[in-house]
Amino acid sequence: MNHEVHFGRIERRHMRRVKNIFFVGIGGTGMSGIAEVLLNLGYSISGSDIKDSAVTQYLAQKGAQIFIGHAAENVEHADVVVVSSAIAENNVEVKQARALEIPVIRRAQMLAELMRFRFGIAIAGTHGKTTTTSLTASLLSDAGLDPTFVIGGILTAAGSNARLGEGHYLVAESDESDCSFWLLQPMISIVTNIDADHLENYNGSYETLKAGFVRFLHNLPFYGLAVLCIDDAGVRSILPEVGRPVRTYGFSEDADVRAINVRQKGLAMHFDVIAHDEDRCFSVTLNMAGKHNVLNALAAIIVGEELGIDRETIIEGLAQFKGVARRFTHHGRIAHDHGFADVFEDYGHHPREIKAVLDAAMEGFAGRRIVAVFQPHRFTRTRDLLDDFAEVLAVCDCLVLTEVYAAGEEPIAGADARDLTRAIRAHGRVEPIFIADKEEIVPHLRHDILQDDDVVIFFGAGDIGRVAKMMDELKIKE
């Protein structure tokens, strides 16, 4: 179908009964992005979070009213209350909103309203969706299409995880963790992979999770496009069930769009792109490390070409892409008691994500010692993937573990960081160093652990990034 249809800009009149929007958990990455877009549309935005942060401060500077802590009176003037999946039904603000008969909606419902009046491009998948969303939004921006985007991470070039554009495209990271991606009605959907995560919301069944992705893809119109990574076994297995136009990508020979001649030079990837329906290929340099990011770039390339972006713009955009915060982000070079080291931070909290980054680091820094500092995220994930974590983390030259970031969960016997330490030790390849108090990690690294020219990578989706930033005090002047 012709995608040159011009969709009307979302304006206040589309939700004319709504003036005041309250976000419970406004500091979360997904929530804050939607709040920022709505602020820029002229709505009165307020919200609460359990702690002050750079995100809440940024929104306050933009004009949002921020409450630190939850209280019933916070929602009394709201026309609608938006909640994230992390907010319990017994939250005092949620209970008060229901008592006052104020509509309470999920984050994805508000995102769906933003998407309703635009050409929606939704990115889903267990891993890689933040980077893929960022690459896609960047290519559309480079092409002058001025998209609106809502991303689960900070797009470095924009300095934000959201932006209201004047164009008619909306690029959004979707969330499969709580099934809320079923609420979206995009025109193009990307699925990067399907891994066994968040199964508690899918009856504990991987097959049910895969069926959930099929349902998400069937929200596309019959003339929409599903962009699917055929290299992923889970995605490949659902292909026969997807009753929408499909374009696959990957390294596999049967992919519609393939990356060939892939090589890593330093922290950049070089590869050629070839499509099964074309005779010629074109060469790409991606300003990110790792084969997993080559796959993410292929998805963005397909979307760009589907929307008519010329190849030179795509090639230039990928070469100049500035990355996403907390995705193998280089904090800088530091001085310590035994020499110097490079410090990186990555959001990876699943074995597959961590392995991809470690592979890229070992390739990009061949011959240098890799020191990983890992904060497990959720007791359930640590329990369910204990052996996988142990296998992946055992390849490090040096490994530091700290206690599990609970993310609201109660402790589970056999699923804390000490249990993970024992499981890794059993592999016999690396002797993990357990440091319970995060405040002690930097002193131990600086004085006892690091050797000259080490590469340090902080992994985790919790608050380990705060520890990585503490290393900034040791940075040397460039």
From Swiss-Prot:
GO terms for cellular component: cytoplasm. Its EC number is 6.3.2.8. It is found in: Cytoplasm. Keywords: ATP-binding, Cell cycle, Cell division, Cell shape, Cell wall biogenesis/degradation, Cytoplasm, Ligase, Nucleotide-binding, Peptidoglycan synthesis. GO terms for molecular function: ATP binding; UDP-N-acetylmuramate-L-alanine ligase activity. Pathway: Cell wall biogenesis; peptidoglycan biosynthesis. GO terms for biological process: cell division; cell wall organization; peptidoglycan biosynthetic process; regulation of cell shape. ATP binds at G125, T126, H127, G128, K129, T130, T131. Belongs to the MurCDEF family. Cell wall formation. This is UDP-N-acetylmuramate--L-alanine ligase. It comes from Dichelobacter nodosus (strain VCS1703A). The gene is murC.
